[in-house]
Design a protein with these regions (language model features):
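Extracellular loop and loop/strand-boundary signature of outer-membrane beta-barrel proteins
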Residues: 41-42, 60-61, 107-113, 165-172, ...
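Residues that define the transmembrane beta-barrel architecture of outer-membrane proteins
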Residues: 50-52, 68-72, 117-121, 143, ...
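Transmembrane beta-barrel strands of outer-membrane/channel proteins
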Residues: 56-60, 72, 78, 88-92, ...
Length: 232
């Protein structure tokens, strides 16, 4: 999952490299005379430098095989530069057993190993190098594409001890980890102050598992988030 996440980010950067055109970028028009040069003006309608923003969002988790997990996220940030900002984030998760969990419990007469996140907190650096617009028949939609990375505090719980001891009915113990969050976000501007967001977020941390309860391994938690926010 760790390699796949960076592969996805790499492909996204490659596909969108043209959206980083500056206001004085040179464009090649083959139908012009060779000695002609054309510059396309890319004026930014929605400036980010020295602006605050706050978002709330709904997230869906794609990590656990045995849990239905969703939740809510809130974040606030400030752009110190047109391309660079800082952000504080809080995520809250709701977990429930799914059909896979119930099937395993019925067939094997034992519950599977589960680790589920309850909440996470992060302080992130935001890099927003890409911007662009989508032309429709009667409206132009402007967007920014950003990336975020920062340390995170993760509150979770698992039934690791019960599973390794072979208990029929498991109990969950609270756990706490320090890790990191890596994400990418596309923000669509509806007005000067209101925007919608779509985000892909990975949470990384090290934790033990049932195969080797005394050894930590890198774990990944993946969320997709839809959000709404305002800036000023």
């Amino acid at each position: 999952m760790f390699k796949i996440s960076f592969l996805v980010l790499g492909l996204m950067l490659l596909m969108t490299r043209n959206t980083q055109a500056g206001e004085k970028s040179l464009y090649d028009f083959l139908w012009l005379d060779p000695d002609k040069k054309v510059y396309v003006l890319q004026n930014k309608l929605f400036k980010k430098e020295h602006t605050f923003y706050a978002d709330v969002g709904y997230m869906v988790n794609f990590t656990s095989k045995f849990q239905e997990t969703s939740g809510f996220t809130g974040r606030a940030g400030f752009y110190v530069h047109e391309e660079w900002g800082v952000e504080l984030m809080i995520n809250s998760y709701n977990n429930s057993n799914n059909d896979e969990f119930r099937n395993v419990r019925i067939i094997n007469a034992q519950e599977p190993f589960i680790r589920r996140l309850n909440s996470s907190y992060a302080a992130m650096a935001i890099w927003s190098p890409f911007y662009g617009k989508i032309n429709t028949f009667n409206r132009i939609f402007y967007f920014d594409w950003s990336f975020g990375l920062g340390p995170a505090k993760i509150d979770a719980e698992s039934n690791l001890k019960s599973v390794t001891q072979g208990d029929v009915v498991t109990t969950f113990k609270k756990e706490s980890y320090t890790g990191a969050i890596l994400k990418t976000n596309v923000k669509f501007h509806l007005t000067e102050n209101i925007h919608l967001g779509a985000e892909y977020m990975n949470t990384y941390y090290r934790a033990p598992g049932p195969r080797n309860p005394k050894s930590d391994r890198l774990r990944t938690n993946t969320d997709v988030i839809l959000s709404v926010g305002f800036s000023f």
